[in-house]
């Protein structure tokens, strides 16, 4: 039996830019087989869309929470429809 796939958009607030969050997210997602993207926002927050099993998503978030220098003070989360055919995880250009 296969695990149910989920897609969620997260928006992180706190000390989240200039501390390696995007690259850590990419490494964790790629290692775990999750897909999606991450980018910096002009207001100092970071947005990430992540697709995978509940366990994969939880593990990526846990990796970020346990990372040195990254200090997530607040997180907004939104459920999204699945992106069929999506491959890999990318760091997108900043949203300025």
PLM features: what roles do these ranges have?
Residues 1-96:
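Intrinsically disordered, low-complexity, mixed-charge
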